[in-house]
Amino acid sequence: MDLQYFILAFSSIFSILNPFGAVPVFITLTESYPKKERDLVAKKTVIYALAILLAFALFGEWILKFFGISLDAFKIAGGILLLLISLDMVRGQQEAKIHRKEIEAAYEIDEIALMPLATPLLAGPGSITACMVAMAEASDIGDKFLVILAILLSLGITYLTLLSAESVLDRIGRLGIRILTRMMGLILTAIAVQMIVNGIRGALL
């Protein structure tokens, strides 16, 4: 098992999940709920997101093989996708991931937790891609376990953040959330560029 690989996988997945950026949307959707129901929404959101990300992480390689897509091609495409998302984060435009119609259509706890919170806010194209690439690049079973651990840790932190969403917003404010989002976007930009470089190098060699 490679600790450096775990750090890379965790950084990529956690940055794209960006739990702090999810706080304003979570508060908007659950503002009329009592604390107990808000906590239930947070729990179900993370469970749904975990199921989606694990499914693509574990079976993503077979999906690529089924469609005849090489890992290097997927790295390039995935890197470009992550780069576009990260640039939106740096420019403070990540909220475009959630459309107003999706927010207005979400009424019940299960509906809110699944859509738009679990997907596309948390388990969206970017985080799914990050998980699939991290798992596909794992050199052995130990590294694959580290990717799963990175997913669990990232969503664990996300769960704790959503549980204390109002406190987080009060403490760091919307400006603080924007700053954190931009910082995570910068980290993700570097990871995305490296992913593209690795994909091109692998395709040419």
Curated annotation (Swiss-Prot):
Subcellular location: Cell membrane
Membrane topology of the entry: Multi-pass membrane protein
GO cellular component: plasma membrane
InterPro entries in alphabetical order: Multi_antbiot-R_MarC
Keyword Membrane recorded: yes
Pfam families listed in its UniProt record: MarC (PF01914)
Transmembrane segments: 7-27, 49-69, 70-90, 112-132, 145-165, 185-205
Keyword Ribosomal protein in annotation: no
Keywords from the UniProt entry: Cell membrane, Membrane, Transmembrane, Transmembrane helix
Family: Belongs to the UPF0056 (MarC) family.
Protein name: UPF0056 membrane protein MJ1677
Protein species of origin: Methanocaldococcus jannaschii (strain ATCC 43067 / DSM 2661 / JAL-1 / JCM 10045 / NBRC 100440)
